Amino acid sequence: MKVRPSVKTMCEHCKIIRRKGRVMVICSANPKHKQRQGK
């Protein structure tokens, strides 16, 4: 999982979601696209 100041979708399978107040990107096609916003 990448931790970034700003998360963006990398492909058409990426979805932006909120979990426990954090913005995250989950991807069904490519697990390398998983991201989380913040420190």
Swiss-Prot record:
Similarity annotation: Belongs to the bacterial ribosomal protein bL36 family.
This protein's record includes keyword Plastid: no
Keyword Ribonucleoprotein in record: yes
Annotated source species: Pediococcus pentosaceus (strain ATCC 25745 / CCUG 21536 / LMG 10740 / 183-1w)
Any one GO molecular function term: structural constituent of ribosome
Gene (name only): rpmJ
This protein's UniProt keywords: Ribonucleoprotein, Ribosomal protein
Signal peptide: none
GO cellular component labels: cytoplasm; ribonucleoprotein complex; ribosome
InterPro entries for this protein: Ribosomal_bL36, Ribosomal_bL36_sp
Protein name: Large ribosomal subunit protein bL36
GO biological processes: translation
